[in-house]
Structures are given as structure tokens and as C-alpha cells.
């Protein structure tokens, strides 16, 4: 949609813009695993007409440093998975710093919970310098952007961002997504 609007306005695409748009599409679709349709592939095929190294983009998006790999292990070992299929983890500044990473260098952990078969939706809470939490919210089954809207965020139906100002906000967000999944699965609180 964004690509078509740019074309309709007469803006000229160049190789750098094509690479950046391709990077965004690859990231937003989880490397073409979700939130896509034939239009996505049509746009990508047009982007390939520009001179950029699309293989390098994929390589850079799928490789990580040793510290990033260690944080990945931590996330997988410490992820809380609720009976509803909702998973979440809180990454504090101290934890992120212990792996010699910064908040911006943790985007790679967002897809990790998707590798666990019982996980239907997940959230990564990343503490910010101001003491609030950036929320990366993803789902395979339920629409989560309306929940994200209630926490100063938004995004796609299955991939959104939000903000939790306090740990109470974290609890509320977890309860909301968990409750929505429980309703979808016809579960009751007793089955938790």
C-alpha cells in the first residue's frame, strides 16, 4: 500500500529506497512467514528491479553476534508461557547491558517465541532508560493491535508495538491478551 501511494504521487524509487522498503517488508512479514499476500510478493518482485543486494539484507537480518545468541538462549529459557498460549518476558536495562547490548539491538528476540509450537501470541517488554517499557506484541491467532492501541501503541493486526509505563501496565496487558486467548480457546480461569 505504501509503495503504491509513493508511485501514485510520482516519487522516484532508487536502490537505497528499494533496499530499505524491502528490509521493512522482510521484517514485517517475519521473512515472509505471516502478514502477507500476493500483493506483497508483487511489490517485492518490483523492488528486485533495483540494484541492491537482497541476499545481504537477509543475511544481516538472520545472523547475530555471540552476545545476541546468548541473550536468545536466555529469552527461550526464561520465557513465561501461560496455558492460554500467551508468552512474555521482561528484559530489564541491567539484563540487556549484561549481554553488552542496547535496546535497539534486541529486535531479533521478537521472533523467538514464534518457534515454540504452543505459543499463540507473545510480548517482549524492554525496559527503557526512562523506566517505562517498550512492548513488542505479536500473534498467530488473535488480533492484537486493538490491545496495543490501549497502551499508546498500534500497528498491524498480528504485529504491533505499545508502551507500558509501569509494571502494573505490564500486568494489565498480559491479562488482556491472556483473557482474549482464553476466550478464543473457550478456557476458564480454572483451567489456568
Q: Whereabouts are the PLM-identified features?
A:
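A short, charged helix-loop
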Residues: 1-24
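Hydrophobic helix-and-loop "lid/oligomerization" segment in the mid-to-C-terminal part
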Residues: 22, 27-192
Amino acid at each position: 500500500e505504501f509503495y503504491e501511494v509513493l508511485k501514485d504521487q510520482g516519487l522516484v524509487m532508487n536502490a537505497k529506497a528499494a533496499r530499505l522498503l524491502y528490509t521493512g517488508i522482510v521484517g514485517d512479514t517475519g521473512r515472509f512467514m505471516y502478514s502477507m499476500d500476493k500483493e506483497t510478493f508483487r511489490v517485492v518482485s518490483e523492488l528486485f528491479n533495483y540494484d541492491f543486494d537482497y541476499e545481504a539484507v537477509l543475511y544481516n537480518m538472520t545472523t547475530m553476534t555471540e552476545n545476541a545468541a546468548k541473550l536468545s538462549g536466555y529469552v527461550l529459557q526464561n520465557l513465561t508461557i501461560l496455558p492460554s498460549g500467551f508468552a512474555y518476558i521482561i528484559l530489564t536495562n541491567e539484563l540487556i547491558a549484561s549481554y553488552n547490548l542496547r535496546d535497539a539491538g534486541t529486535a531479533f528476540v521478537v521472533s523467538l517465541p514464534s518457534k515454540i509450537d504452543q505459543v499463540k501470541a507473545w510480548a517482549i517488554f524492554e525496559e527503557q532508560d526512562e523506566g517505562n517499557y517498550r512492548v513488542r506484541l505479536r500473534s498467530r491467532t488473535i488480533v492484537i493491535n486493538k490491545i496495543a492501541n490501549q497502551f499508546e501503541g498500534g500497528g498491524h493486526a498480528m504485529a504491533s508495538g505499545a508502551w507500558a509505563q509501569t509494571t502494573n501496565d505490564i500486568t494489565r496487558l498480559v491479562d488482556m491478551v491472556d483473557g482474549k486467548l482464553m476466550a478464543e480457546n473457550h478456557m476458564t480461569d480454572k483451567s489456568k
